[in-house]
């Protein structure tokens, strides 16, 4: 069953917190507290401050989310 009320956004990881939590600054300027999705955790993808990520947010609480993808940093 697919979740209906999800919002996708891209942002920059600004801070790494304990227990796999991260603070992400989205492109529209919102600060979000996020955690890593199970697929990223299973595949041991390393997320560091400064990485660009794709975040999934609930429509009910826009201050918390889940990191679903780490974007490549092409500077």
From Swiss-Prot:
GO terms for MF: ribosome binding; rRNA binding; translation initiation factor activity
Family annotation (InterPro entries): NA-bd_OB-fold, RNA-binding_domain_S1_IF1, TIF_IF1
Occurrences of domain S1-like (ranges): 1-72
Protein keywords: Chloroplast, Initiation factor, Plastid, Protein biosynthesis, RNA-binding, rRNA-binding
Main localization, broad class: plastid
Pfam families to which the protein is assigned, alphabetical: eIF-1a
Subcellular location field: Plastid, Chloroplast
Gene3D superfamilies for the chain: Nucleic acid-binding proteins
Keyword flag Transport: no
Gene Ontology terms: cellular component: chloroplast; cytosol
Family: Belongs to the IF-1 family.
Known partners and oligomeric status: Component of the 30S ribosomal translation pre-initiation complex which assembles on the 30S ribosome in the order IF-2 and IF-3, IF-1 and N-formylmethionyl-tRNA(fMet); mRNA recruitment can occur at any time during PIC assembly.
NCBIfam families: infA
Purpose of the protein: One of the essential components for the initiation of protein synthesis. Stabilizes the binding of IF-2 and IF-3 on the 30S subunit to which N-formylmethionyl-tRNA(fMet) subsequently binds. Helps modulate mRNA selection, yielding the 30S pre-initiation complex (PIC). Upon addition of the 50S ribosomal subunit IF-1, IF-2 and IF-3 are released leaving the mature 70S translation initiation complex.
UniProt protein name: Translation initiation factor IF-1, chloroplastic
Organism whose genome encodes this protein: Pinus koraiensis
Gene designation per UniProt: infA
